[in-house]
Amino acid sequence: MCNKNEELKQYLVPGKHVHLVGIGGVSMRPLGLVLQGMGMIVTGSDMNASVSTDELIAKGIHVSIGHKAENVIGADCIIRTAAAHNDNPEIAAARSHGIPLFERAQAWGVIMQAYQNAVCISGTHGKTTATSMMTHILMEAGCDPTVMIGGYLPLLNAGHRVGEGDTIVLESCEYCDSFLNFAPTLAVILNIEADHLDYFKDLKDVEKSFRKFAELSSNGVIANGDDPHVVETLEGLEYTTFGLCIQNTVHPENISLDWRHFDVICDDEYYCHLDLKVIGKHNALNALAAVAAAWKLGVPGEAVTEGLKTFGGADRRMQYKGNFNGADVYDDYAHHPDELKATIEAVRTMKYDRIIIAFQPHTYSRTKALFDDFIRELSKADHLVLAEIYAARERNTVGISSLDLQAQIPGSVYCRTLPQVTAYLRTIAGPGDVILTVGAGDIFRAGEALLK
C-alpha cells in the first residue's frame, strides 16, 4: 500500500528531492514541472526517451532512461505512475530502503490544495473536451491557470500548463477511484455510465465512486441534470445542474439545429452566447458544463463567448485528418458505446453519403461487458471495419475477439492488423464518404497511413 495523502504533504515542500517513476507519462510530465516550480528537486525515469522526456531535460530535470534501482538513491520520496508495479526495480528499491512511496493521483490531490480554485472535471465521457473548453475560457479571461488534460490541446501545444494564477483545472478520472485522492473546490460531473468494469463491479459501484467524489468538493458540485444516473447518484446532495432541459440551472435557449449556436441562461438570467466550432449534442453539453463552471467562478460572460469561439477541439476528438480519394478522414477517441452513439449522431448531421467506421475496441473487459451495446451502436455505420481489440493494460482472460463482434454485425469486415485496415479502406473509400478511425488505442495510425 502507498502512504496516505496527508503524509505526502511533508515531502512536497521546497528543497525536498522527489523522484517520479514514469515521468514521461501524460500526467506525470506536468506533475514534474509543477513540483519543480514549487521549489523541489525533481528527478525521474522512464522506459523510453520521448518528446516528453526531452522537454523535461530541457527544463533542467534529470531524467534517466530505463528503470534501475540506483535511480532512487537520495530521493526523499517516490511518486509513481499507475503503470509502475511493485516488480519495477525502482519501486522495489524504494520499498526495501524505506523510501516513502506515493501514487500520482495522491500528489495532484496535495498540489491542488495550494490553489484557491481547484476545478476537477469528471465523467464517463467528455472529460478531455470539457477540460479543454474550460482551459480556453480561463485563458481568455486572463486567469493564468495551471492545467492538466488527458490529451493534447493545440492552444497549449501540450496537454498541460503551469500557470501563476490561483486556479487549477484537472481532468479527473474515476478509474481505480483515482479522483478520490483529489481535493476539488468545484467538482464537475458530465455523465455517469457503466465503464472500467475491470475495476468496478457494476454501474452501482461506479455511482458510489462518483458520489464520494462529489462529497469531496468544498465549494459546490456542477452536474448534468439530464443524466438519470447522475441524478440518482447525487440524491440528497445540493448541486448546480446544467443540461438541455429548461429545468436545469444552466441551460441553452435559441439553439441551432446543429447544436453549435445558442444563448446560455444561468439561474434564469442571460449569461452569454456561444458559437461553437465543434459539432454534436454531446459537445453542446460539454460546453454547458464548462460554462457552468466559469459562471460559478465569476468569469465574465464575454470571456466565455470569446474563449469557446476559438476552441476547435482536443486531439483525437472528431479531429479532421485529411481527404483520401474524395472521402474526408476523421479520427475520434470514442471507445464506449455511448461515445460511439454521440459521434455517429454528430456525423449524420454533416450529410455525407456514407459513414465508414474503422473501429478498434479498447480492452477485453470493456468489449465483453458492453458487447451487446457495441453491436447496437456499431451497426449504425454504413460500412464497418473492425480491427483487433487493443489490449492496453490487460490480458485476454475473458476469451473475446473483434471476430465475435464481426459475427454479430452483418456486412462488417474484420482486419487482424492495422495495415490490413488501411489497405481495405483504400478499396472502398470514395467521394461523398466520411472515414472515421475510432478507438482509444492506435487505430489512428490506419487513417494516417491512408493519407500518406
Walk through the language-model features, giving the residues of each:
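A glycine-rich beta-strand to alpha-helix segment
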Residues: Q420-L451
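N-terminal leader/targeting and accessory segments in enzymes
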Residues: M1-E103, A107, H251-E253, I279, ...
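Beta-strand->loop->alpha-helix junctions that form or flank phosphate-binding loops
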Residues: S45-D46, S64-H67, F102-G109, M148-I149, ...
